[in-house]
């Protein structure tokens, strides 16, 4: 059908991609500081909660850090007791050891309680932030202009609500506590190591740059492969999505082998990049283990020499070795959380970018009331293009009297559907004006203006729910009797009664449990129930069989009496009784009149009409 594509959402391209792999190179924000600033403004209302999280995380970490040194006293007491027992000068002081173990148990128990509290508070804050963002995005969608959705894919819009908000929430929930815990652990452990032995601390710290250098080398090498993996994961998802969505076309043209070959090529690249990235990423743990063991060996050797000289105790060596492990662990955690923060900020940037998009002006000062609209419509020298380089409607002028049935016909791309979009203010004209009852459409509030129009599109839209609920969508406060009356007027009552449950029959997600013709009848019943003074029928009967079309046509004829109606028709035989037929070509009206008048002119309309019957024969 002609420019009906303007009403359709662009084809899906798999932009949602899929979940980000572990260790994958993070997407970086274009404006890191600006995005962080906006995110902080959302978190700002939870200052007390954030402060409590930081305090609890720090306290829990401090108790954990103190534990090993106190446990070292147990090791020292055991070794000294063993030496006394061997020398025959005494035995184990289990009373002393028991007291220390109780103290350590209490410390770790308090640490767990504080960790639980900070986790509980942070999860609550994160979910509240995500809830608020999702709510704002949902409200924003209803205020966005049509051009935004027609220039983007399904996945690109949906990912703002799903993937991006989830990534933001996950990063927010983990990054703050991880950073606080890691920094507190590093500082606390460093202080405790210095209190045991500055020399051993120096040895442990010297090994640290080796660890950082090796990890940085591996990360740098693997990031390129992770980037390729991420890119081709998106390609894989896109191919699967498109193949599934168009599986009937693929099968009808016997293109299964071509699709499989194309998929295999993409999958081979994904396999190669994923193998290399995961292999290199998997090398990090062995490298850290090697460096860590090297550090343990150096510390143990130095500690043994110092213990022989009675500079430190055996318990101090045991505690110090544990501290060395605790000292390197936060470095890995911070490296991981930095990637997570980058992904979080990039996701928040996309969310805020969406929230900052230009909105439609929903209201005007001193708006014209839509009550009592008669339905007179004037197009005065309207010019419009979706972009500056291409003008679709060049100089469109017409006067439509109240109650007239106006058919708009023309070849593909003539601008028929665009006229309807301008009438409902999905777009605003570049030049000229559109008047309803003598008032410029820009003088109405958009919402109230659109309430004056009833619309039936070629692409039927029904949501998951009962048939009763779907018809009632046209008038939410309608009674069951009004819904049934609308269904009868649309000649839909009979087939509804034959369905399991009748009006309570549950439609599935894409309403595939009813036929295309039945879907069309339900959307017409919805428009009848809405009872708007002006009707727009965009190929309302093009998707149904001839018998169903006849039933619909009779119902629509009754509905259109006394109402201004615009019919965009491809089958010209359906608009013979229109009061006025506007014939469009290249954005202009080239002919207008009744069906008989236009045929008598033997012009462009006659050519269109005759060509359809030639094709049919």
Where are these regions (language model features)?
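An intracellular "coupling" helix at the cytosolic face of ABC transporter transmembrane type-1 domains
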Residues: 146-147, 163-172, 176, 221-242, ...
